Amino acid sequence: GSTLSPHIWRFNERIRLHGKEASDEEICDAFEAIDSARGDVTLTYFEFSALAALYCIAKEHMDVAILEIGLGGRLDAFNAIDPDIAVITSIGLDHQAFLGETREAIGAEKAGILRSRQHVVLGQEMPASVMQRCEALSLQPRCWGAEFSSVCDIEQGTWQLTRQGHSMYEIPLTAIAPHNIALAC
């Protein structure tokens, strides 16, 4: 299963089960279960959305779930999950009103998803705040450019993920944006 945010046309785009969007029925069932279980607890839209995704994925007994952290990381609803692998693809100046004014501040927020004894994959040009968090947790991240990279072939419409000079995967360019190549790891 997987999640993404934001959706473009309809909420169902946020939750994928077995490679397909969750159905209206699956999502409504999830919302009903969450609403009845929450009691007097108030949930934000994002918390409700994250719980719905987790409910749907758990109900399908998925072996693997790829959960896209939405806003930031440290305070994101999905950060309640203790993942085996954490991926930070890039740090830009987004959501500055919530995450901070600089790449360092935003990096510190995004690095809030990192846990000890975890595999970590990092995109290009990580701010020192991310690397410091890795060091504080004794993590050894796989870094874009050092451990892996890619080669785009526009004519063939593919990109190849390479590790130590050896091609690992060839993926259609339409499957993933080239600047998010770290997601494939």
Segments the model singles out, each with a brief description of its role:
Residues 21-43, 93-107, 111, 118-185:
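Adenine nucleotide phosphate-binding catalytic loops in nucleotide-utilizing enzymes
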Residues 79-90:
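Inter-motif core of Ras-like GTPase G domains
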